[in-house]
Amino acid sequence: MSLALLQQHSPKIIDGKAIAQSVLEEVKLEVERYKAQGIEPCLAVVLVGEDPASQVYVRNKVQKAAFVGIRSLEFRFDADLSEDELLTQIDRLNTERGVHGILVQLPLPKQINETRVLERIHPQKDVDGFHSENVGGLSQGRDVLTPCTPTGCIRLLKDSLGDDLSGLHAVVIGRSNIVGKPMAALLLKESCTVTVVHSKTRNIEQVCQQADIVVAAVGKANMINASYLKADAVVIDVGINRIMTHEKTRLVGDVDFEDALPMVSAITPVPGGVGPMTIAYLMKNTLQAVRLQHPQI
């Protein structure tokens, strides 16, 4: 049965596409409100090189910006761009008052230090939420820009469980700076009891079996099956893995979807779960950047 048919027959499947569309509609209304007050939200996207996947991601981001009414500026550079040249471009965008958000598409060519580049972006324009000031601010519970994927995951959880997540035990599988660590911090902010497991954790399966919420972000295809899950858990699958089946490539998550589905109360599919939320929350973060730069509104 196709995923579309499964979603019609199973309320357990969290429809990330539909929820992301709702987020985009919210953003669209807010953009109109800002424009009525003379502020045109603007996102600058920087792409270095010609990586095909990066080009697709940039195109999708620009299209979604156009849909919600956010002005986008694209800056494309050859793969041999020097780090100093890229930093100079970021400095220009930092000082440009009409630019509210800056996104540097990763990965960058090997001659460029990603950490130095991301740290150069002004924290209030850092729509990816990767700057150390924003990372620290999140851990302190301050109103800062947070990474798009885990922030989108919180919205998916609230759509399934309601706005109050307090007291629930959440297990985050993976400790990356992009998803795992900020996911744990955001869940703590929601007053969940949070456990982070990773490659060095003993008895991962037993730990996961205690969880009301499981967020899988480890990058291993179908690693989590029903034996890891307790009945009625809510599962958010952040993984995107390409595997070969019957001489065809298909996308799967970190969770064995078909095995887990009968066990859980709700689960995100791959594709069509977390992925659409990431770009939707990039648009949401661009508006958050506008608010931070124009606190009087």
From Swiss-Prot:
Gene Ontology CC: cytosol
Keyword hit for Oxidoreductase: yes
Keyword flag DNA damage: no
Residues that hold NADP(+) according to the record: G174, R175, S176, S199, I240
The entry's keywords: Amino-acid biosynthesis, Histidine biosynthesis, Hydrolase, Methionine biosynthesis, Multifunctional enzyme, NADP, One-carbon metabolism, Oxidoreductase, Purine biosynthesis
Organism lineage string: Bacteria, Pseudomonadati, Pseudomonadota, Gammaproteobacteria, Moraxellales
Originating species: Acinetobacter baylyi (strain ATCC 33305 / BD413 / ADP1)
One record GO biological process: methionine biosynthetic process
Protein name: Bifunctional protein FolD 1
PROSITE patterns: THF_DHG_CYH_2
Pathway: One-carbon metabolism; tetrahydrofolate interconversion
Reactions catalysed according to its record: (6R)-5,10-methylene-5,6,7,8-tetrahydrofolate + NADP(+) = (6R)-5,10-methenyltetrahydrofolate + NADPH; (6R)-5,10-methenyltetrahydrofolate + H2O = (6R)-10-formyltetrahydrofolate + H(+)
Self-association state and partner proteins as the record states: Homodimer.
NCBIfam families found in the cross-reference section: PRK10792.1 (NF008058), PRK14188.1 (NF010785)
Family of this protein: Belongs to the tetrahydrofolate dehydrogenase/cyclohydrolase family.
Enzyme Commission (EC) number: 1.5.1.5, 3.5.4.9
UniProt GO MF annotations: methenyltetrahydrofolate cyclohydrolase activity; methylenetetrahydrofolate dehydrogenase (NADP+) activity
SUPFAM superfamilies from the UniProt entry: Aminoacid dehydrogenase-like, N-terminal domain, NAD(P)-binding Rossmann-fold domains
Function, as annotated: Catalyzes the oxidation of 5,10-methylenetetrahydrofolate to 5,10-methenyltetrahydrofolate and then the hydrolysis of 5,10-methenyltetrahydrofolate to 10-formyltetrahydrofolate.
